[in-house]
Amino acid sequence: VELRTTDLVIRPPVPDDAPEAFVLMNDPDVRRWNPTRACPDLATAEQWCRSGADWSDGSHASWHAVDPGTGRMVGNVSLFAIDRDDLVGKIGYRVLPAARGRGVARQMVDAVTRWAFESHGLMRVQLEHAVPNLASCRVALAAGFLLEGTARSAYAVPGGGREDCHLHGRLPGD
């Protein structure tokens, strides 16, 4: 499934995205808010791209946003924890340092959320972030997600720490 916005092509990951994926997965700002392991080499980044493209179990769907002018990856967005019974899912994203401040995150989140409602039949998409991650709060609000509350100590951060978590939600009619 390929999605388009004014400035982006949002498509499934491909192994050729590995160099950008490697930079993304090792970026200090991404690592600060994502309790995932570091990416030690390009082969691991390539495998990450391959696994992101496998949507066969129906629990997630991942895309890479690319600049249509260069064809280079600028970000990653995933719809995950998809519950087909309750028709809800969660969305998360990351943006390469060189692409920050250009609306990439907002466009990715909005496009994938619309797809989740229109093509996947979901009735709710949630976006969660650590409260100190102000940039993610701005992205959520700009993409039409309402701030619904704060869950105490609910967000794991690297190093075994915990942060309070903002819960944002978006419904098809929002």
Tell what function each PLM region has:
Residues R50-A53, A154-A156:
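Short, P/G- and charge-enriched loop/turn segments at secondary-structure junctions
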Residues P13, R32, D41-A43, S56, ...:
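A short hydrophobic/aromatic micro-motif that marks alpha-helical segments and, especially, helix-coil
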Residues V1-P28, S62-D174:
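Acyl-donor (CoA/ACP) binding surface of acyl/acetyltransferases
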Residues A53-S59:
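Short loop/turn motifs at secondary-structure junctions and domain boundaries
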Residues D29-S51, W63:
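Conserved GNAT-fold acetyl-CoA-binding loop/helix
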